[in-house]
């Protein structure tokens, strides 16, 4: 019994030590509609949380109705013991249309353009590597820019976890939950169809919901 208790204690201490030394890191990406990017990354191993927001512009305290030159972005907090920056950038590229310079799918304009933010020289090099590998696979130029450190402004509360909200809203199809409205929007916008057309078998690699529909 003494040996069993000792082993249990050792395992407990080891687990606690590992948890204490797990480092949470962040990645900020712009991929068009932030509801969609948030959902995709909340279905990726190692991601702790994905938060919708705004970045890349000059306006302080942007809002959905007034965000100036900001893009819709998502801040992805991840456990660096489980995944890493390069892996997440690889996944991101395969969830968007990296050949579109003017927006994403049915959403057009600066707000919906893609971007990857690198906060360190190491992250910049990793992002450049991911883009080069993506271009080699596609045989096309990836127009998604890699930009530097940026201030992240969190979006309004109603945008967070929009894809799974049960709150009702009135749409042209009648009263729907936000989750239902989100699914209709995503399908009508052609997001998944275009990503699969572009990336083929690599589309949504690493995103667990991709096999079940979005």
Regions found by a protein language model. Name each.
Residues 4-16:
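Bacterial N-terminal signal peptides
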Residues 21-214:
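Flexible coil/turn and secondary-structure edge motifs
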């Amino acid at each position: 019994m003494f040996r069993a208790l000792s082993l249990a204690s050792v395992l407990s201490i080891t687990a606690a030590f590992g948890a204490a030394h797990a480092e949470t890191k962040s990645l900020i990406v712009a991929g068009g509609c932030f509801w969609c990017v948030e959902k995709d990354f909340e279905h990726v191993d190692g991601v702790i949380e994905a938060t919708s927001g705004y970045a890349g512009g000059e306006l302080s305290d942007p809002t959905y109705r007034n965000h100036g030159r900001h893009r819709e972005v998502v801040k992805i907090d991840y456990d660096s013991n489980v995944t890493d920056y390069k892996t997440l950038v690889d996944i991101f590229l395969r969830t968007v249309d990296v050949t579109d310079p003017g927006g994403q799918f049915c959403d057009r304009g600066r707000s919906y353009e893609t971007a990857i933010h690198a906060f360190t020289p190491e992250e910049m090099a990793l992002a450049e590597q991911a883009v080069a590998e993506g271009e080699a696979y596609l045989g096309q130029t990836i127009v998604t820019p890699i930009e530097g450190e940026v201030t992240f402004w969190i979006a309004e509360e109603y945008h967070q976890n929009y894809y799974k909200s049960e709150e009702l809203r009135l749409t042209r199809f009648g009263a729907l939950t936000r989750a239902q409205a989100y699914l209709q929007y995503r399908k009508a916008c052609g997001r998944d169809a275009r990503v699969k057309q572009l990336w083929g078998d690599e589309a949504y690699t690493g995103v667990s919901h991709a096999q079940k529909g979005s």
